């Protein structure tokens, strides 16, 4: 039985298969190795991938894009609100959760983000099964390093609903290193690897220390304001200006015409990664006018010059954050479809002239390839001289905190597991509660960076009941947190006086 790795990104999804000692991305039924993460609801059917993306011009209100941005979030979450404001499909609140409102004329229904992700996972499963000629269930799924517990849980539920058996969730930077076997060739050496990922809607830069075969995340930064879509939009705006210059018609306020230009610009952007020029032709763009325009790579680079600067600045900030110079970096790994852009690769190379830049695996395929290798390891298919399983040490992406009450009665948060903690990990903490109560509720929260902890950040709670009340003093509650490498969290609370105990497990899937 083959093992597979699946990467579900904001704009695209990809599946790789590990078989006969190697991992390869497999093409979908359209012959493409990368599938648009787009779902369209029609009167009689649901379509996923390129067909949904192409039909969006005529069916925008019932076509869902960038579902990963909203997956596992509450309706009130600022990230969800941003997604809702930018989406052509109506999103409503139901039980505190966002739901897509679908109305095809034949069907009116509410669809959750998990339902949409399930359809994309099902497409990936079908793609793998078609390539292998047999059923496939075991999978390793990639997640961004800054994905919270609720997001991972939602992603896992979607994959399970699609019929997958999740072997493990692996952070995207770790998958990228696995794809190139980094740490395998010199397991006792120490090196710094910078993982640069420019995806469809975000940019992430991660510094990983590889030491004695162990991956340790030194720092990571994610920027949601820059991604491949920004380059597409910039090119589409240029095409709109060219149309106005030629035909004296300003179409930038016409949503349908601009969506057509976005599709054409996206195709041209991809072509310009390998060609010196690309042709943008749109049939009946506006008022029956066919639009035909050629764009050179040099022109594209000029149009996007400010975007390139935005893509490079985060690298310099990360180096400063970890106290490294460019010469301290041993390798740079490129990930994400937009990391294919030659100008971007040149700018990164200028920053690291003496550093090995790894891009032999297509950047939009490297993460699922690494996930497939991890799946092969977990199924016992890997037979390398080095046990790669020893180097896939995951790290905690966010701080895990417990809410307590200080002496003045105000809430305070104590970090039990700080971000960057290598997994598996175990921590103990004594929580004190007033002796005159008979039950204690332990609440756990997660927080990324210096963000404020709010109720939106709570992901688990455990209640210890029927405690013997005390006339004076406090209850000492011993709390033990154990997080496994797969991200599952086991929480045990024990009253030190009575020995009464409760335990819960928070699974990643």
Curated annotation (Swiss-Prot):
It holds the Pfam family HSP70. Component of ribosome-associated complex (RAC). SUPFAM superfamilies: Actin-like ATPase domain, Heat shock protein 70kD (HSP70), peptide-binding domain. GO terms for biological process: chaperone cofactor-dependent protein refolding; protein refolding. CDD domains: ASKHA_NBD_HSP70_HSPA14. Component of the ribosome-associated complex (RAC), a complex involved in folding or maintaining nascent polypeptides in a folding-competent state. This is Heat shock 70 kDa protein 14-A. Keywords: ATP-binding, Chaperone, Cytoplasm, Nucleotide-binding. Gene3D superfamilies: 3.30.30.30, 3.30.420.40, Actin, Chain A, domain 4, Substrate Binding Domain Of DNAk, Chain A, domain 1. Transmembrane segments: none annotated. The keyword Kinase does not apply. The keyword Lipid metabolism does not apply. One of its GO terms (molecular function) is ATP hydrolysis activity.
